[in-house]
Structure formats: C-alpha cells, structure tokens
C-alpha cells in the first residue's frame, strides 16, 4: 500500500474540551503554533491528504487551506462521531486519526501502524502503559458497524475498537510522543520543556 496516497490523515479537533474550561484545545498555542497545526504538519510529512474534524471555529481551521469536516451527529458525541463524519464525507479506504492535542506524534506513525496491522480493519497506538484508541488507522469497512454503535447510544472508543476486530500496536519506544494536553497546567509544562 502506498501510504502517502491511500491513507487520509485526520486531525480530530471536534471535542468540547471540558477539562480545558471549554476552550477549543486545538487552537491553544505551543511554541507559537496552534496544537492542531503541529498534528497536521506531522501528518502531512507522512500522507498526501489531511483533513480536520472540527465543530467550532471552522473558519480558523479553514484558513490553513485544509478541508474541515463537522460532525454529522447532533451534540458532537465524542471522537467516534468525528471518525464517522469523516468517513461519510471523504473518499478513500483508510484513515489515520490523531487528536489535536498530540503534537509530538512520531514521523513513522502511519508506516508502523500499517505494517503491524496484519489484516485488522482497525489498529491503534499502545505506548507501553496505556492504549490510545483515538490515534488509530481505520478502514472504511467498519463504517456501518460504527454508525450502528453510535445510534445505539454507545460512545466508548476502546470498546468499539475491540468490537471492530482491532488490536493495539506497540509504540513503547515513543512513549512521550503520545502524551496529550488536557489541562492548562499540562500545556504550561510543555511550553517549559520543549
């Protein structure tokens, strides 16, 4: 599979950011650049087509020139709704999803997930300690199952990934690459570190 052309990269920036006081997390700056832009830039070094899933401030995301896709389900019920919306509105068979608050994803993310997926329709990152199911390579074949799952009122990402027949891929050698920003204090610590 030619990764550059067969996988669509997706920055998931559609969340409500409750732990950040409702601030659009993707627009918070790290070293002078919005968090979501760090993720998009990292994906663009690996893939030729990248889009953004966002439910607020679309005009800011659109100013980048990237296509912005809003959730098709009411009330923006979490990252799975963003994944479904992108699959409903984008062509292609494979999608690499990454949350907007993971600015240090590794440069071999797409290649490693693809190489180690075997025949699974879904694979996600495991950093050696915990799963990161929203950093996932997903095949379009799971779209009907995902729609059914969401229509049943389910929202749990990890439960769905396993239900869809997926497995984790070990990235314990890149553990720090998957730390995400959930509070203003964490963002401040990152500003100091990097």
From Swiss-Prot:
Q: Which reaction does it catalyse?
A: Mo-molybdopterin + GTP + H(+) = Mo-molybdopterin guanine dinucleotide + diphosphate
Gene Ontology MF terms: GTP binding; magnesium ion binding; molybdenum cofactor guanylyltransferase activity; nucleotidyltransferase activity
**Which InterPro entries does this one have?**
MobA-like_NTP_Trfase, Molybde_CF_guanTrfase, Nucleotide-diphossugar_trans
Induction field: Is expressed at very low levels under both aerobic and anaerobic growth conditions.
Please describe what happens when the gene is knocked out. Cells lacking this gene are chlorate-resistant, fail to synthesize MGD and accumulate elevated quantities of MPT.
Q: What is the effect of changing residue 15 to L?
A: Complete loss of catalytic activity. Still capable of binding MPT and MGD and interacting with both MoeA and MobB
Q: Where in the cell is it found?
A: Cytoplasm
Q: According to its record, what is known about the domains?
A: The N-terminal domain determines nucleotide recognition and specific binding, while the C-terminal domain determines the specific binding to the target protein. When the N-terminal domain of MobA is fused to the C-terminal domain of MocA, comparable kinetic constants as wild-type MobA are obtained with GTP, and the activity with CTP is completely lost. Consistent results are obtained when the N-terminal domain of MocA is fused to the C-terminal domain of MobA: the kinetic constants with CTP are comparable with the ones found for wild-type MocA, although no activity with GTP is detected.
Family affiliation:
Belongs to the MobA family.
The subunit field of the Swiss-Prot or TrEMBL record says: Monomer. An equilibrium exists between a monomeric and oligomeric form of the enzyme, which could be an octamer; whether this oligomeric arrangement is of functional relevance is unclear. Interacts with MoeA and MobB in vivo.
Output this protein's name: Molybdenum cofactor guanylyltransferase
Gene name tied to this protein: mobA
């Amino acid at each position: 599979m030619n990764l550059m052309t067969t996988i669509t990269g997706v920055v998931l920036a559609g969340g409500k950011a409750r732990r950040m006081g409702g601030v659009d997390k993707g627009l918070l700056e790290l070293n002078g650049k919005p968090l979501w832009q760090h993720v998009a830039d990292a994906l663009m070094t690996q893939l030729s087509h990248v889009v953004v899933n966002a439910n607020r401030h679309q005009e800011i995301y659109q100013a980048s020139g990237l296509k912005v896709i809003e959730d098709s389900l009411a009330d923006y019920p979490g990252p799975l709704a963003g994944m479904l919306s992108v699959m409903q509105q984008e062509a292609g068979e494979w999608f690499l999803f990454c949350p907007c608050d993971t600015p240090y994803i590794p440069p071999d993310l797409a290649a490693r997930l693809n190489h180690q997926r075997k025949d699974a329709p879904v694979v996600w990152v495991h950093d050696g300690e915990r799963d990161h199911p929203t950093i996932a390579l997903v095949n379009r074949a799971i779209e009907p199952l995902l729609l059914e799952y969401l229509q049943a009122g389910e929202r749990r990402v990890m439960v769905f990934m396993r239900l869809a027949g997926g497995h984790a891929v070990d990235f314990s050698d890149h553990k720090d690459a998957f730390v995400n920003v959930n509070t203003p204090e964490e963002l401040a610590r990152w500003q100091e570190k990097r």
